[in-house]
Design a protein with these regions (language model features):
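Generic alpha-helical structural context detector
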Residues: 60, 88, 222, 271-274, ...
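Active-site cores that bind ATP or allylic diphosphates and position pyrophosphate for catalysis
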Residues: 98, 102-233, 238-247, 255-256, ...
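Residue-level signal for inorganic ion chemistry
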Residues: 27, 58, 90, 94, ...
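Glycine- and acidic
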Residues: 6-12, 40-44, 198-204, 253-255, ...
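N-terminal Rossmann-like or analogous alpha/beta NTP/dinucleotide-binding catalytic cores
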Residues: 1-115, 213-226
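C-terminal accessory/binding modules appended to enzymatic or scaffolding proteins
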Residues: 340, 402, 407-458
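Catalytic adenosine-cofactor/nucleotide-binding cores of aminoacyl-tRNA synthetases and other
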Residues: 225-396, 459-491
Length: 491
């Protein structure tokens, strides 16, 4: 295969949302698989809606996902003169013309089409102007747009899409479309094609919603005498009601930064978004970076739209269960050395991080994180459910307290258990277990009742990791102190 050059060209009108992120990921994977280049172009020609904040958000989102680009990101607005020059060339070679129709005239044509119950399409009034008529109108100072002159022959634009196969659009169904506004500002349909030609883009990989522009851009390529890239249009991402995912409708819940802030791992997000519209023949679900690059191909992109099962629920089910499962998988199985920086960053946002966790307490901290991560779904769980393991200021779950402390009348025997544990020669699993067995026998308490009460007393939770390991990682002093404190709660 010739050198592959692809691009991601977002408009900086808001944050990076999951639809745009998925497009970027597919382009990045394709470039990396084929040893090609992944370019980043900021399409900022809509000056009124573009913002520096949005640009920064897009760059931060891509960086967080681990998508590196191979150029210095540039702005489409830097090449306005080049876009205008392309329009001039199309005028000169007869592939475009100046249109002097006013807004009122066009509105009248649209209204007439509505009354006739026909689809409005520009009728080519100014296409038939002679050179002399055009000159007179220009000399009179009449404003004009520039329209592309679509062939009037009985034919069609044909696209061999790498996902959807052969696509045809009849010339008769494409109006002479505007490529430059009356104020001289080139439109997206022209700018995008001209930029792709200049950058040598070999594959245009984008959402299905871009398909409407593709026949027009093919005509622009042909009008400028440029070779066509290959096109691959991805299926759309829908919400549970089968509506297209959008920033306007769904808000921050479809923003990449929303998932970063809610404790999702970057690679888990990449893994999930790839599977949201692409699959390998063997249905493999979890990939390392190298595995995914090797496995990815455009033929695996689904033609049917995918559903992102977001929910308005603010609880644990706020997002797609598959995303949660994928994140939990990586959280529980990725090498601890890779996970620790993410844990540190999360804890550092609160009062929970201590420099000692990287020095004299490192061994204890690593073993504790290894113990508790097995039940966690997001990094935020280290801050909430994991708090009791690294800080004495933690929340007691009301349900667990009511069930395991108050109903168990644990206040009667927790202080005595604390005393007996404080007197152990060694506070390690073997001696602790032996003492607990003696205590159970002496007090005639069922093992489950004791374990649940102790777990709630020392962690504030009703469930958790291996009981004996929890005791040992917390250490004698913390366990004893918390048992004594919990005795007051259970009264």
């Amino acid at each position: 295969m010739d050198d592959v050059i692809v691009r991601f060209a977002p408009s900086p009108t808001g944050y990076l949302h999951i639809g745009g992120a998925r497009t970027a990921i597919f382009n990045w994977l394709y470039a990396r698989k084929h040893g090609g280049r992944f370019l980043l172009r900021i399409e900022d020609t809509d000056a009124e809606r573009s913002s520096d904040e949005a640009i920064a958000g897009i760059l931060d989102g891509l960086s967080w996902l681990g998508l590196d680009w191979d150029n210095v990101p540039y702005f489409q607005s830097q090449f306005t003169a080049e876009h205008q020059d392309a329009a001039k060339r199309l005028l000169e070679n007869g592939r475009a013309y100046k249109c002097f129709c006013t807004k009122a005239q066009l509105d009248e044509k649209r209204e007439q089409a509505r009354k006739n119950k026909t689809t409005y399409q520009y009728d080519g009034t100014c296409r038939r102007l002679t050179a002399t008529q055009v000159t007179r109108k220009e000399q009179a100072g009449e404003p004009y747009t520039i329209r592309f002159k679509v062939p009037q022959a009985a034919g069609a634009v044909r696209i061999d899409d790498l996902v959807y196969g052969n696509i045809e659009k009849r010339y008769a169904d494409i109006e002479d479309f505007i490529i430059v506004r009356a104020n001289g500002q080139p439109l997206y349909v022209l700018c995008n094609a001209v930029d792709d030609i200049r950058d040598g883009i070999t594959h245009v990989i984008r959402g299905q919603d871009g398909l409407a522009n593709t026949p027009k851009q093919v005509l622009i390529y042909q009008g400028l005498g440029a070779p066509l890239p290959k096109f691959a249009h991805m299926s759309l991402t829908l919400d549970p009601q089968k509506a297209k995912i959008s920033k306007r409708k769904h808000g921050e819940q479809v923003a990449v930064h929303y998932y970063r802030d809610h404790g999702f791992l970057p690679w888990a997000m990449v893994n999930f978004l790839v599977l949201l519209g692409w699959a390998r023949a063997d249905s493999q679900e979890f990939f390392t970076k190298s595995e995914l690059i090797d496995a990815f191909d455009l033929g695996g992109i689904n033609r049917t739209n995918s559903v992102f099962n977001i929910s308005a629920d603010e609880g644990k089910h706020f997002t797609d269960p598959k995303l949660m499962n994928i994140n939990a998988h990586y959280l529980r199985h990725m090498p601890m050395a890779e996970l620790l920086p993410f844990i540190k960053a999360r804890l550092a946002k609160t009062d929970l991080w201590k420099p000692a966790f990287e020095t004299e307490q490192r061994s204890w901290f690593v073993s504790t994180m290894e113990l508790i991560r097995g039940r966690f779904n997001t990094l935020n769980d280290f801050e909430t459910y994991g708090r009791a393991y690294i800080n004495d200021d933690f929340i007691m779950d009301e349900t667990a307290v009511r069930k395991n402390l108050k109903e168990a009348a644990a206040g009667q025997w927790l202080p005595e258990l604390a005393k007996r544990l404080s007197e152990l020669k060694d506070f390690e699993s073997g001696t602790i277990e032996a003492e607990l067995r003696l205590f159970l026998k002496d007090k005639d308490i069922k093992p489950g009742k004791l374990m649940n009460a102790v777990r709630t007393a020392i962690t504030g939770q009703g469930v958790g990791p291996d009981f004996m390991k929890v005791l040992t990682v917390l250490g004698r002093q913390r366990v004893v102190n918390r048992l004594i404190s919990a005795a007051g709660i259970s009264v």
